[in-house]
Amino acid sequence: MPQSMVASLASDGYRAALQEASKKNKLNVDPFQVSRVKRISNRLIANATYFKPEASQWAWEINIEDSNEVNAYCMPGGKIMVYSGLIRKLNATDDELAAVIGHEISHALREHGRERMSTAAVQQLGLIGFAAYISNTNSRNRANATMQAVSLGTTLFFALPNSRTQEREADAIGLELAARSGFNPFASVTLWEKMKRQDTKKPPEFLSTHPSDDNRIRELTDLAYKLKPLYESNRPR
């Protein structure tokens, strides 16, 4: 799927999510937490170009939806949403929030959303052919078709889990991104341990697409030790 199509679908889907949250008076309701999440995210964004220079041209956005969900995402093109449940239920520290947001940013930097959407579109939904149809219809049909494409693209982004390979890649890049930004990489370990404790009753939404296990925690611990010198050289003094 062309990057321009993915970016357009992501932007439109993000706009729809913002409008829905705003309609329910759930968007950016806590100024302190909004300021906090933006401060953390902006430190990560400042170092994102190390992994993808084009990220400096992205129209980054950062918002918080008031929700009990323990979750966050970064759509293609840098559209970040953090659910307040992630902060409240886990009592997340700045370093732990950086671990989650850095992980989600890494999915966008490596275009994992595009890969997932493209695979599903080609194999099941024919979205590329559908896009060609959009470009050749009259304006009214085009508007209706575009709305369907936005819904479809957003559904694909949220519904399809990342592969284990994509998760490992986002773990590694996200942790390095956090360390380069001066956040403690060991916070990823404490975060996943908190997630696992939440998992004893009802699994957090984050775990439905980001499965946690002891192997993953061990891998994160090993990565954190390797990245400790990088963190030490970049942490705030």
Regions found by a protein language model. Name each.
Residues 1-237:
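A Zn2+-metalloprotease active-site environment signal
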